[in-house]
Amino acid sequence: MIFIDRINRILDDRIDMKFWGVRGTLPVSGDKSLKYGGNTSCMTLEFPREQFFIFDCGSGIKNLGDSLVAQKRKDIHGKIFISHPHWDHINAIPFFSPLYMQGNDFEVLGANQSDITMREMVSAQMDGVYFPITFSQFAARVYFHDL
């Protein structure tokens, strides 16, 4: 019985890592992108007990969101780390469907830039001018912390 308990513990402590996008600057499509994919930066680490980390919000985060919805995941509690606020690392935040689902909560962490906070950088791209849906329409709870 002890051996089975040890095996179960090892399996329970598994970390899942997935790359949803690895490109820089612009997403691409076509034969040249088949090997590594065409989406811009997004990677996830999922730990036991539903700890969920997202690194960057390039175009790959759209597929991540679609996958979470297809799995019927609810009450997602995640941390989103933004490595730096270049467009290819934040431009797909408005397309991450779990942000529009009540019961989810996300903490967004990243470095401020001069006098601009991470919250200001993210919400600026969703001010109604650049994107038709505003930041206030997220149904999930979203918290920001500048590092």
Residue ranges and their predicted role:
Residues 1-147:
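Binuclear metal-dependent hydrolase catalytic cores
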